């Protein structure tokens, strides 16, 4: 039975331009794929769901990837509780930009670790792949965080990416509140790349707010 306490989670989707951040977010919230989408400045979406028998209100901020909006980044990085660092497996540049975003998040938060998941998007375009799965896994290990490949178009692992970030936030907060611990640490192991398709039973009914 799901808990009735409604906890809000401020999730931020970060990455360069054109790697599918907005498509991932809209697929999660509205369950459809957008072929054409205007470059995002900043869009916020809300969705209520149940993750591991706990009710959660996801407040998802889809951010600008373009360089001209870089001055806005520190503002949303200060308020975010967890971050999806998204790159396209078809773009080497978007992959290389992930390091900059991760370092900026840790600098703004003044932390050695913070809830982050590395997301390799557009995994349905495997024939156009220029970033291997192993490279994504290696970068996530370097960050001490989890890794997953997704496809907004084919709806592969879309919910898993967001829900696993919520789980990581919960784990982080639990460690931070543990008086006998020394603060939150990175996960002990990376996330294995899930097979195509959403995992069954990880979430109950979801409601767009």
Curated annotation (Swiss-Prot):
It catalyses: GTP + H2O = GDP + phosphate + H(+). It holds the Pfam family Ras. A motif (Effector region) lies at residues 37-45. It comes from the Eukaryota. A lipid is attached at residue 206 (S-geranylgeranyl cysteine). One of its GO terms (molecular function) is GTP binding. GO terms for cellular component: plasma membrane. Keywords: Cell membrane, GTP-binding, Hydrolase, Lipoprotein, Membrane, Methylation, Nucleotide-binding, Palmitate, Prenylation. The modification Cysteine methyl ester is found at residue 206. SMART domains: RAB, RAN, RAS, RHO. Alternates between an inactive form bound to GDP and an active form bound to GTP. Activated by a guanine nucleotide-exchange factor (GEF) and inactivated by a GTPase-activating protein (GAP). This is Ras-like protein.
